[in-house]
């Protein structure tokens, strides 16, 4: 998954968390790329709790040198589907099962992932 901030994603919805629970039991892995994870932390408590339990299967990464606009909004499940948001204002995008569209999404994610580092720790240590 990739998005500037995941503010418009329904990751905290009970149905989404239930689907992710079933999905992760198949020994799958998930990587999220974002400019900032603040909206996710504030709005998606269920997802945060789920991630705490499954942190070994979920990576959150960011590249502080990129601008928010450099992050595409997309979901890529290799070999299954690619979903790309083209216009967030009008909620318009493309869902595709075609390999060529998956490749375009992979290339967009690769551009972000190359210099990304781990971000959004599961727990924060304080003094």
What is each residue range found by the language model?
Residues 1-32:
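PLD-like (HKD) phosphodiesterase/transphosphatidyltransferase domain
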Residues 8-9, 40-41, 83-84, 91:
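Short catalytic/ligand-binding loop motif for oxyanion handling, primarily in non-cytosolic enzymes
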Residues 13-16, 43, 105:
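Amphipathic coiled-coil/heptad-repeat helices and related helical stalk/stem segments
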Residues 19-23, 50-51, 112:
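Hydrophobic helix-cap positions at the C-terminus of alpha-helices
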Residues 29-30, 57, 118:
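A general structural signal for well-ordered secondary-structure junctions
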Residues 33-78:
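HKD-type phospholipase D/PLD-like phosphodiesterase module
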Residues 59-106:
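HKD (HxKxxxxD) catalytic microenvironment of the phospholipase D
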Residues 108-127:
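Charged phosphate-binding loop/patch that engages nucleotide di/tri-phosphates or the phosphate backbone
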């Amino acid at each position: 998954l990739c998005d500037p901030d995941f503010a418009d994603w329904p990751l905290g919805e009970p149905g989404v968390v239930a689907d992710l629970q079933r999905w992760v039991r198949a020994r799958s892995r998930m990587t999220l790329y974002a400019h900032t994870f603040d909206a996710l932390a504030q709005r998606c408590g269920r997802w945060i709790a789920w991630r705490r339990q499954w942190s070994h299967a979920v990576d959150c990464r960011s590249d502080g040198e990129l601008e928010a606009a450099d992050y595409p909004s997309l979901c890529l499940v290799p070999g299954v589907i690619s979903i790309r948001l083209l216009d967030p204002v009008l909620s318009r995008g493309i869902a595709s099962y075609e390999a060529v569209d998956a490749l375009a999404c992979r290339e967009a994610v690769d551009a972000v992932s190359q210099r990304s580092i781990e971000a959004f720790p599961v727990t924060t240590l304080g003094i």
